Amino acid sequence: MKHFSLAFLLAVLSFNLSAAHHEKEQQEGFTGLISSEVFDLAGEMDLYVEKYQSCGDAVNEKHYHPVGTLVYMIDGKAASLSSGEWEEYSKGSYWFEPSLWVHGGNEPDQLQFGDNQCRQTLGIRASRKGEEPTVFVK
């Protein structure tokens, strides 16, 4: 009985943590954030390393990054308009999102990969101390 109670308690805690994480993810405007680490850069800036995983066509709110972002494809396919034209990226490739480039939301002519396509990406971005690495545009 002790083992069942402990397992049940762990399951409830896991569900609550998952729900809290999902709620934060919804507030932040990104889909699929599964981990995020922040590293101090000489006390003046922070380096964010974030892993995302999602299936289907990504829907992110319109936003920009005050400091540029590097996105690395761990697995799957994604597309970016960062070069000025839609480009498709797959496992092992990467792209750079320039500082202050507004993107996300309903992008015209966005490449579609379908509901069965899953992807994992690693986003690496910096920000000045006290500033958010991502700013959402209303």
Where are these regions (language model features)?
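Glycine- and acidic-residue-biased ligand/ion/polar-headgroup-sensing regions
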Residues: V67-G84
